[in-house]
């Protein structure tokens, strides 16, 4: 069982990492986006495909940034703590040229107490 203090720490770590990802994207820093993922993370970006590992994930975000996408915001995000070392974030999202839904961001607490994405499944709907 996860204590309230553990849950708060996990939620804080996820919020900090998620904010860092959004800030990196909005400033055109694809490497900053990619460093929020674990080395072997899997990102499923519907309808674009599945990307595995930091290199593929960074290339995906760099492509979007190069195409002029920016200003990402999460709409009504929710975070559910799964266990003592992970949580799932779900949310709507919007940016200047697209919008959609985050079906599952699996954030895992690292040895240093920070959170990184192990799984990222989102969908562009327009």
Residue ranges and their predicted role:
Residues 2-32, 42-126:
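A beta-strand edge to alpha-helix "cap/lid" segment located at domain peripheries
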């Amino acid at each position: 069982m996860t204590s309230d203090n553990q849950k708060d720490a996990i939620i804080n770590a996820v919020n900090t990492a998620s904010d860092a990802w959004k800030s990196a994207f909005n400033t055109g820093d694809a490497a900053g986006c990619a460093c929020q993922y674990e080395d072997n993370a899997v990102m499923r970006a519907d309808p674009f495909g599945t990307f595995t590992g930091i290199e593929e994930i960074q290339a995906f975000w760099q492509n979007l940034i190069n195409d002029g996408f920016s200003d990402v915001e999460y709409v009504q995000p929710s975070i559910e703590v799964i266990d003592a070392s992970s949580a799932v974030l779900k949310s709507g999202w919007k940016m200047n040229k697209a919008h959609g839904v985050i079906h599952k961001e699996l954030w895992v607490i690292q040895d240093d107490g920070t959170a990184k994405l192990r799984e990222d499944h989102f969908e562009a709907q327009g």
